[in-house]
Amino acid sequence: MTNQRESILRYAAENFGTTPEYLWKSTPDAAVLRHRENGKWYGLLTNIPAEKLGLPSGRTVHILNVKCSPLETGSLLQKTGIFPAYHMNKTHWVTVLLDGTLPEPELFWLLEESYSLSNGNQFS
């Protein structure tokens, strides 16, 4: 487990009361972060082949998928380490590479935004 992954899980537990859910036997490290109240996802931590993000192949990378406003997607994708969402709606989600490219405060801000947007009132 990467340090950033551990930090995100700790942040989600401390700030949102979230316990990660491990839903798939085929990907036992994939952790879903969801609201207790409405069951909606606000984060997905998993490992994927680097080539799924257009990176050089031959390695596995740790990622976080977070929800974002469609108005912010374009500017977020200009940042190094943020990609069109892997396996999610690319209008409402982005994928963040957990390799230290983005500092933890920025990761936590993205997680907070995702938590807020997925509360059931917007962009469902």
Kindly give the residue locations of the regions a language model identified.
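Charge-dense, helix-prone N-terminal extensions
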Residues: 1-124
